[in-house]
Amino acid sequence: MENQTIALLKECSAGCRMAEESMCQIRKATDDQKLGALIAEYKGKHEKLKARVDSMLAAEGYAPKEPPMMASAFAKASTGVKLSWKEDSHQAAKILMDGCSMGIKTISSHINQSPEASAESLGAAKDLVRMEEEFNRELKRFV
């Protein structure tokens, strides 16, 4: 149980960090005020959930997991390339939607592989999936 709990929390922490990095990069590249406000709102939600998850990890004596360096570098480069093709709010929203979909798939997979994880960690992971689903829905108006 403890191993599944810790692994799930670490994935949630890393996922929140990756999402925050992407949102910062994309927010700088868009001048659409409504999209910028939506990104800021969800960045704040990710920061809040990350703090919750990180405190659960700390209570168990573990440090938060940083996103894998290669994955982080690839995501940043990929986002930069996609934005260079067409730097507008439509492209920015599409990139963020892709990120939401990836987060939903990744965290849902970890939830399914962690049936023995604590109820609190499963709750945090499910909250992250719901947040990504909501963000994805709200981004549709910008594509």
What do the predicted segments below correspond to?
Residues 1-30, 91-115:
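Alpha-helical bundle segments that constitute or directly flank the non-heme di-iron/ferroxidase center
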Residues 4-12, 33-51, 89-96, 119-131:
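Alpha-helical scaffold segments that form or flank carboxylate-/histidine-based iron centers
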Residues 20, 50, 54-57, 78-81, ...:
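A structural signal for well-ordered alpha-helices, especially hydrophobic packing surfaces
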Residues 24, 28-31, 35, 58, ...:
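Short, flexible helix-adjacent loops and helix caps
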Residues 36-70, 139-143:
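Conserved alpha-helical segments that form or flank metal/cofactor-binding pockets of metalloenzymes
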Residues 55-104:
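Carboxylate-rich helix-loop segments that flank metal/cofactor sites and access channels
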Residues 62-67, 116-123:
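Short, highly charge-biased, low-complexity peptide segments
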